[in-house]
């Protein structure tokens, strides 16, 4: 979502398993999501509805029915609870971003959503990135360990492990 925001387009991270990961080269399997970038929210609804659903080639894909994202795009949000992470929103330093964020929150309130500020204790907030890094790096290492050219592929001879990998990868 950040790359999309930096480029003035829409990015969407769907619920894990909503879109099949079949054919995707994994980074960290338990964290990987398939999403898209589009020019606007309407296009994102169309793309997500087309991609979502059960795929027998991906055992982690969801069996749940696919919502009609496009039809539901203008649905009433009255009474829906939306949490704003105060720990995160307080850290916004760019005034334009801060003002846009406040505008979105106020729009949700005007449309009848129940907006609640939620705080995550600082010690937990500080643990999020290191925890993600440990999980992602461990899974990435495991997922990509077979790509060293030693166990799988066209292994070439060498006098050391480094030389075998270099020779196998540059053949």
Task: Identify the residue ranges that each predicted region occupies.
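FAD-binding core of FAD-dependent oxidoreductases
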Residues: 1-8
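A short helix-breaking turn/cap at a secondary-structure junction
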Residues: 9-100, 151, 159-170
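Glycine-rich, small-residue loops and helix-cap segments
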Residues: 12, 102, 107-118, 127-129, ...
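Conserved short-loop catalytic and cofactor-binding motifs
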Residues: 32-35, 128, 132
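Conserved catalytic core of Hanks-type protein kinase domains
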Residues: 50, 134-135
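Flexible, glycine/charged-enriched surface loops at secondary-structure junctions
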Residues: 56-62, 110-122
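Short acidic loop-to-helix transition motifs that present clustered carboxylates
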Residues: 65-66, 123-126
């Amino acid at each position: 979502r950040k790359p999309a925001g930096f480029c003035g387009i829409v990015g969407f991270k769907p619920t894990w398993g909503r879109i099949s990961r079949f054919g995707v080269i994994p980074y960290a399997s338990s964290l990987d999501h398939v999403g898209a970038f589009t020019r606007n929210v309407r296009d994102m609804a169309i793309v997500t509805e087309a991609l979502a659903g059960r795929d027998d080639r991906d055992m982690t894909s969801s069996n749940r029915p696919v919502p009609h994202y496009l039809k539901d795009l203008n649905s009433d949000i009255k009474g829906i609870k939306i949490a704003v992470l105060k720990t995160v929103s307080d850290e916004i330093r760019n005034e334009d971003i801060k003002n846009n964020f406040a505008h979105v929150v106020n729009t949700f309130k005007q449309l009848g959503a129940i907006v609640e500020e939620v705080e995550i204790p600082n010690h937990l907030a500080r643990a999020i990135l290191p925890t993600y890094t440990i999980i992602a790096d461990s899974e990435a290492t495991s997922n990509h360990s077979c790509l060293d050219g030693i166990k799988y592929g066209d292994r070439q001879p060498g006098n050391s492990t480094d030389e075998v990998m270099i020779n196998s990868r540059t053949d």
